[in-house]
Each structure stands twice: as structure tokens, then as C-alpha cells.
Regions:
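Canonical RRM/RBD RNA-binding surface and closely related RRM-like beta-sheet modules
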Residues: 1-78
């Protein structure tokens, strides 16, 4: 069963591909999406990643939550 994760405080330079590659180190990523402003198309600083299974999602949260990337500590947790 897949598990969806919220990813907050991501660098504004991140796009879908960078987000996916960041999480692929911890399991199979089904989808990765950086949320963007409808008008400007610029990153809003958060996104969502869907991992193939719960154990991969758990490993990703454990490894990446509060990890510093480009001077920002990202937030990773399971969506509710």
C-alpha cells in the first residue's frame, strides 16, 4: 500500500525531479510533486511524495526529516 508524505520548507530551487531523486535513495517513489503558484509557476516551498510502501515512507521520514538542504531544514511527515 502506498504512503503519501508531506515535504515542507524545501528550497525554492527544487522541482519535481530533484524532489523525486532526493527520496529515491530511500525507496521506490511513485510520484513527487512540488507545489507551485498558479500565476508565477514558482515553487511554494512544499510538496508531496508518494512512496510505494509504508516501510519505504518510514525510512524516508527517518532519514530526511530535519535534514538541511541549501541552508534550510526540510520537514517530512506522513499526510493525514
Amino acid at each position: 500500500m502506498s504512503t503519501k508524505l508531506f515535504v515542507g520548507s524545501i528550497p525554492l530551487s527544487f522541482n519535481n525531479e530533484i524532489l523525486k531523486k532526493t527520496f529515491e535513495k530511500h525507496g521506490t517513489v511513485l510520484t513527487a510533486r512540488v507545489m507551485t503558484d498558479r500565476t508565477s509557476k514558482k515553487s511554494r516551498g512544499f510538496g508531496f511524495v508518494e512512496m510505494e510502501n509504508t516501510s519505504d515512507a518510514y525510512e524516508a521520514v527517518k532519514a530526511l526529516n530535519e535534514l538541511e538542504i541549501e541552508g534550510k531544514s526540510i520537514v517530512v511527515n506522513e499526510t493525514r
